[in-house]
Amino acid sequence: MRKLGFIILCLCTAWTAFGQSKLDLQSQMMLLQIRNTAIPTYNSRTRSFERPREVQQNVMAMVEFMGQNALDELDAQGAKVLRVRGDIAIVMMPTADVECIAELKCVRRLELSRPVYQKMDIVRKTIGIDKIHQGIDLPQAYTGKGVVTGIVDGGIDPNHINFLKPDGTTRFGYISKITATTTTQQGYLYQNYYPRAVLDTMKQQDNTYAIEDFATDSYTNFHGTHTSGIMAGGYKGNILAAKTDDQNLSYNVTVPNLYYGGATESEIVASCGDLRDQFIAFGVDDIINYSKLSGPKRKPCVINLSLGSNLGAHDPNSVMNRFLSLCGEDAIICVAAGNEADNTVALTAKFDKADSTVQTFVRPMIEGEYKTAKKTYYNLRNGQICAYSNDADEFELQIVVTNSARKNKVAVRIPVAENTNGQPVIYSSGGDYAINGAVVNSTFAKAFEGYVSAASIKDPETGRYYVLAQFLTSDNQTTNKDGNYKLGLLIKSKKAGQRVDVYGDAQFVYFDDYAQEGWTKGSRNGSISDMACANNVISVGSYNVRNHWPSLDGYVYGYNKQGEGNDFPVGEASRFSSFGTLADGRNLPDICAPGASVISSVNTFCVTNPDMGYTSAALQAKFEKGGKAYYWHQSLGTSMATPVVAGAIALWLEADPTLTYKDVVRIIRQTAVKDEYVKNTGDPVQWGAGKFDAYAGLKQVLLEKGANGIQGVKTEQREMPVLTMTGSRSFTAFLAKAKQMNVRAYTLSGQLVHSQVAQGNEININASSWEKGVYLIQVNGSPAQRIIIY
């Protein structure tokens, strides 16, 4: 009877679907898109716009719930609970019942899943990981032993040699694969993979397989293998690598692998499949559960998320960001800042008085023709735009079509004058874009083929008023071939002191003024990924360490175009690296790490896929063994910078497994390098605290927590000093917990040649007057260590 009553309730309230205040606006617009097969969506795999053949029967959602019986009530109403963290549940529910489930008394907020996008030789040396691996003047070498390095990504090849132990067994402890599908009643497929040796000890379970039999989750994507390799790749055997002596031509040599990662002996855990935010949350939860339950005691864990989206409130209070924040209490989570700062994909309007107006154009990233498999578009504008007030107060937003031939006079106005409670206003050109409930406007059709929709609501997630616009337009080649008709936004304040933050999804459009008077250009500040705005996560930007590389085809390539200057100056912040000043006052990212460009392992199945068109020009190294070829190549992005930090944090966690997010982020900021590039180039917000320094961070960990590793081993009862050569005739000495440094240098015959005392735990020694040779260095009476002065 209860379920029957629920169905009757759904039928009675379906007509008010857009008035549900517990369902965020983006989810409401997503439901409109799912249920209306006339609306085309972009398929990134086929690189075309496609209309769904049928309505999706089930959807995944996050529910923020309340009450002791909430989970039972959700289950009783057809929402299958998959995961729970705090007061947030990941559920699968029928598409037809979303609004009704949102109205249950036990539901505080409900959010549907939304797409996110994937966003080391020089690197290791630059941030000091090589020193840590070698244990140079450290109590011991740190390689991530006993630490779980987790990753959620796509394009993972877990049997790449970079992830195998020297005996050929896998370093992966567990992989989960989550994909949406119409072939199961649940609407998704959840598969689990374990090492065969572990699987053989388990009872037979459905959808559980051996990691050794896993090929890849994607034959068209290398990303996850690349990021995993940066974070935790450990193969150090021989490879065939390209080398150059003149930055023009290259030659191939067999050398020990240069391109292994940070936590070379860590235990790797991954989640892959469809890249939607709630599938990602599912994967993060899987990794944390593994770190808690896979051994006799909990293992320290760091998780890399080289994923994100620029859409969203950029607020820590969204359901997804609250979930990540809760996960950040159980693992150190590193999130990519994003790669959208190349374009002005954000805009912040601050109004001194009421009835003030800011206007901007929605400009296509690809101007002119854009060919897909099925259709050619002209000045394609596609995607979503969110505009948020700084509080619950409304503002007025109009989507306009202007005519530059008539001094940008407005030809069509699509107004969102006040709160529509989620009810969309839709304008369409008709024809192929005939949408139920849309206004077919002849002037709009003269300008574009396509549609524009917009709706507004007081956001149940953040309490802020906002407008969401969704659109797909292509210039009409009969009546707008010259592109005079353009799409724009007009934002009008309703009170003094109002702030409106506008974010594009950074896929096909950005905000520009076309050099027109009275119009406003967008900003790079605000390009930060929404997921990076969660509390208890470390957001990572990118700086440049390489702008050219030798390839296996005999040539050297780079990103810099001949005669056009240096696009990626070594040492500077990468121009694409996203950043933002949020409405709550925070500046992100937290830190920058090497991300342009980084050479790492890549998915063999992607490289060998004929449709991908790989040649030796795209590859920097390869190795063949047992009939399988393995490859390495360069890539760039905050996706690459983030696992640099995650891998280094695994080394810190080996040194001190008790480190928390607050410890790690404080040490990152405290030990960041602020060199001349940080001080004098780029936007200060884009740099965060500066450049990440893994070695200085580890020294600080040792200083605060001592040199205890996971196994509780100390090389000496007494703390050992750290000696670091800073030149051929100079070095520093560091001793954790020391208040005064007393350094003595002796020849091998025992003659004292130098004595120096300083306050603190670190001292600089100038050996320029010493004879060449080997010296014994004693710090505070510790056992002597050898150094060589050249």
Q: What are the residue ranges of the model-derived segments?
A:
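C-terminal subdomain of the subtilisin-like protease fold in secreted/lumenal serine endopeptidases
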Residues: 47-51, 251, 291-294, 300-309, ...
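Catalytic-core environment of secreted peptidases
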Residues: 184-212, 404-405, 439-440, 452, ...
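Autoinhibitory N-terminal propeptides
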Residues: 5-8, 17-139, 148
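N-terminal domain-start motif of subtilase-like serine proteases
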Residues: 28-55, 97, 118-168, 205-222, ...
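C-terminal tail/sorting-segment detector
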Residues: 772-790
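Subtilisin-like serine protease catalytic core
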Residues: 136-279, 296-299, 328-330, 341-345, ...
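Hydrolase catalytic cores
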Residues: 228, 236, 240-248, 269-273, ...
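Substrate-binding/access-modulating region of protease and related hydrolase catalytic domains
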Residues: 272-351, 371, 379-396, 402-411, ...
